[in-house]
Amino acid sequence: MAEADIAVIGLAVMGQNLILNMNDHGFTVCAFNRTVKLVDDFLANEAKGTKIIGAHSIEEMCKKLKRPRRVMMLIKAGTPVDMMIDAIVPHLEEGDIIIDGGNSEYTDSNRRSEQLAAKGIMFVGCGVSGGEEGARFGPSLMPGGNPKAWPHLKDIFQKIAAKSNGEPCCDWVGNAGSGHFVKMVHNGIEYGDMQLIAEAYHLLSKAVELNHDQMAEVLDDWNKGELESFLIEITANILKYRDEQGEPIVPKIRDSAGQKGTGKWTCFAALEYGLPVTLIGEAVFARCLSALKDERVRASKQLPRPQVSPDTVVQDKRVFIKQISKALYASKIVSYAQGFMLLAEASKQFNWNLNFGAIALMWRGGCIIRSRFLGDIEHAFQKNKQLSNLLLDDFFTKAITEAQDSWRVVVCAAVRLGIPVPAFSSALAFYDGYTSEVVPANLLQAQRDYFGAHTYELLAKPGTWVHTNWTGTGGRVTSNAYNA
């Protein structure tokens, strides 16, 4: 008998919590997992006493679904998703819906959307953010794919999503792989935010020489203002935490950061579309550098470092703490500006017609990068839907103008003390490049023409490309002989 509103495949913690969330909001969910024992265990424990039902096969699961059938997968990205889709499709009919709620690459979602459309099945790639707690009590959801599926999913998704000022942190993103693209950029920005906070922590520790309680107090104070965010909040909590010996735990953690690859995907997309998403790139590379722990230990003993006392660089600690907060805020503005540049380019490339204000709202609650700051981004795009860059919005122009001097002081101080701040400094370099009427790319073009005859465009004659015989002795090279 068809009784379930939706099926969820994958009973790891995220899948279980999303099912329980749906149940809390009055939806009947059919739970399925390849390992049938997990279904029985879930029904006997976490789901006991609820309306949640289970299935021991894909065929049974599909028979228990109301039409149009809605099947959501929360399984490992890549080949497992394709294999599961292949197993589900024979049991579906035209007009049924498959939702991929995993961390899939947007290119895979583009392909799956097209392939399933040819079979009459509607595909939705849905970014899900917020971790285990978000899945249970309200995630940020970013659905994209076949727009005809949205009316059949909207009620479920918007009810289970996090709320910000009463508005659900979920809306339709766009066609094909747009939902997973937006989630990918979200994850890239998350990498950037985490690296910026890590650099601020490093400066507070090494340049201002604060202890963990003092640093936690500073972050608690930051969390009352423009930097208010989930990541600042949890960082303060981390710094307050004490282990069994009553000591701060962070200094005891090996300083070698892992990554699952979604930050790299953002960088790959930025390179593919020719966009300078530099801060996220530096955040990824900072993790790569951190992984060279043994080499760094050897290098720290062999290679020279600045012999400068923090007291000679930071004369007023209270002032410098304020300057760090301003540098963090300015760098954060640049990071989000770069992220939305990438979203805008993908929207143009794929004709997705993304609503950037709505995306900012989706991120305001339930997800890892949720913050007060996103409300300002939402307002910027609501005010000017054609805004080409966040830096050009009046609010952010004013904010970065006020922060600029502090930003430069902090980066210079870090350089003098030998404290690595790749995210702060790359954000500042981007800002200086973006605000420069002339950059030395004219010399790059001359070099390319010299060794490769790639030609260059003249300022006085836009659209006119010329080649110079730089040596005057013949010996020209051709652009097809060397391409750079």
From Swiss-Prot:
Q: Which GO terms describe its biological process?
A: D-gluconate metabolic process; defense response to Gram-negative bacterium; negative regulation of gene expression; pentose-phosphate shunt, oxidative branch
Q: Which domain of life is it from?
A: Eukaryota
List residues binding NADP(+).
Answer: 10-15, 33-35, 75-77, 103
Which amino acids does the record list as binding substrate? 103, 129-131, 186-187, 191, 260, 287, 448, 454
* Metabolic or biological pathway: Carbohydrate degradation; pentose phosphate pathway; D-ribulose 5-phosphate from D-glucose 6-phosphate (oxidative stage): step 3/3
GO cellular component annotations of the record: cytosol
Q: Catalysed reaction(s)?
A: 6-phospho-D-gluconate + NADP(+) = D-ribulose 5-phosphate + CO2 + NADPH
The record's annotation in Pfam families points to: 6PGD, NAD_binding_2
For this protein, the record's InterPro entries field holds:
6-PGluconate_DH-like_C_sf (IPR008927), 6PGD_dom2 (IPR013328), 6PGDH_C (IPR006114), 6PGDH_Gnd/GntZ (IPR006113), 6PGDH_NADP-bd (IPR006115), 6PGdom_BS (IPR006184), NAD(P)-bd_dom_sf (IPR036291), Pgluconate_DH (IPR006183)
The family assignment reads:
Belongs to the 6-phosphogluconate dehydrogenase family.
What is the name of the protein in this document? 6-phosphogluconate dehydrogenase, decarboxylating
| Native source species | Caenorhabditis elegans
